[in-house]
């Protein structure tokens, strides 16, 4: 009798853990509901109505479709869902193709081999800003230039790119030089980006290195704003000029 009581416990410990499911398999699994929403990032919501815990594991590089639009996941995803429970996870993603997406997204069997080196790089660089990572995907897949990328972000002339966009573009250019030094990307030959980056105090030093401009031995010239007064009585060029223009008490 004691053996019969212990038998369920022994069988439970002997049974191997359920294999993780990828998102496509999870969508077909009875008792599971998987909904993929969001954009960049994607939001994966899993509802487990079964009596068995479930693990969903998806490597980076999954391409999801929403109408004519496509997004690709930039990092691996793992979701552990207890029995009769729900869980939600977000995964960084980037658009492969512009367009008005339909929701929810659906995983596809499509692949993009050109992204393999970039995905490997991102796996070891967890601090990569989202904007930079998304631009890198567009550069690798479509060789997008700076102006086209700005249009995809809704920045149309005469609007100027934000400093954040300029820094992201220069950071992306640095990564591209590291991943594919033999290739010339459209981003690297964009004269407007070069001019904007050299004028940007945050991106200037890195831009000079990327564009092959010798760095001066002395510190870079200070910005004009640092030369102006910040409080009354500061000896700035404007204050000195104003003092020279004031009439003297002796009338001279």
Give the residues covered by each predicted segment.
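Asparagine-centered strand-capping/turn motif at beta-strand->loop junctions
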Residues: 36, 40, 44-56
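Acidic (Asp/Glu-rich), glycine- and aromatic
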Residues: 31, 52-71
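Acidic/charged, solvent-exposed loop-and-adjacent secondary-structure segments enriched in E/D, K/R, S/T
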Residues: 147-251
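Intrinsically disordered, low-complexity Pro/Gly/Ser/Thr-rich segments with frequent PxxP/GP/PP motifs
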Residues: 63-107
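Terminal connector regions
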Residues: 94-149, 154
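Bacterial N-terminal signal peptides
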Residues: 4-12
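Low-complexity, acidic Ser/Thr/Pro/Gly-rich terminal tails and inter-domain linkers that flank the onset
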Residues: 18-38
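A mature extracytoplasmic/lumenal domain signature
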Residues: 50, 58-62, 93-95, 153
């Amino acid at each position: 009798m004691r053996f019969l009581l212990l038998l369920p416990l022994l069988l439970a410990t002997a049974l191997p853990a359920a294999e993780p499911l990828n998102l496509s398999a999870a969508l077909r699994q009875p008792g599971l509901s998987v909904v993929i929403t969001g954009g960049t990032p994607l939001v994966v919501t899993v509802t487990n109505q079964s009596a068995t815990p479930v693990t969903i594991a998806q490597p980076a590089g999954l391409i999801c479709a929403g109408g004519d639009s496509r997004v690709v996941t930039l990092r691996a995803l793992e979701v552990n869902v207890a029995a009769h429970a729900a869980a939600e996870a977000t995964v960084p993603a980037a658009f492969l193709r512009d367009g008005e997406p339909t929701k929810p997204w659906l995983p596809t069997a499509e692949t993009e081999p050109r992204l393999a080196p970039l995905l490997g790089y991102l796996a070891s660089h967890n601090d990569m800003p989202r904007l930079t990572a998304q631009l890198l995907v567009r550069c690798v897949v479509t060789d997008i230039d700076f102006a086209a990328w700005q249009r995809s972000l809704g920045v149309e002339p005469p609007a100027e790119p934000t400093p954040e966009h300029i820094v992201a573009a220069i950071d992306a250019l640095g990564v591209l030089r590291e991943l594919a030094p033999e290739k010339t990307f459209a981003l690297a030959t964009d004269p407007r980006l070069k001019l904007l980056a050299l004028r940007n105090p945050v991106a200037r030093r890195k831009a000079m290195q990327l564009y092959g401009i010798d760095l001066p031995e002395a510190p870079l010239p200070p910005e004009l704003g640092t030369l102006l007064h910040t409080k009354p009585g500061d000896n700035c060029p404007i204050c000195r000029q104003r003092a020279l223009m004031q009439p003297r008490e002796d009338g001279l």
